[in-house]
């Protein structure tokens, strides 16, 4: 998926919950941005696509002071987790847990269910 198409999709899908979006990088199939939510938190998004499949992702949800709430990613460094490489950092970067949220849609569902 092209990053420009993905940005438009994100803007349309979550417009009512988003205060603003800051684009950090938009290049071919790579998208990096900060989504500022209306509750004062923000989500740092990085997605790298290979056609219709997401190859690499990270979604880091930060509180208004920019402290980590939850960070989801698929960096391949926790090989012993049952659903490697998918994992999340909860509260602290070293607090690693199994994650079944592997898309922005699933992450936003979690954020809007606990953060609002």
Region roles according to the model:
Residues 1-47, 51:
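Negatively charged, low-complexity tracts enriched in Asp/Glu with abundant Ser/Thr
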Residues 19, 62-66, 77, 83, ...:
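Short linear sequence elements within intrinsically disordered, low-complexity coil regions
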Residues 32-35, 60, 84, 97:
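Short alpha-helical interface elements
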Residues 46-77:
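Short, conserved beta-strand/beta-arch hydrophobic-aromatic motifs that form part
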Residues 52-58, 78-88, 108-110:
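Short, surface-exposed linear segments at secondary-structure transitions and domain or protein termini
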Residues 70-98:
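Histidine-centered catalytic/metal-coordination loop motif
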Residues 91-116:
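Well-ordered alpha/beta subsegment
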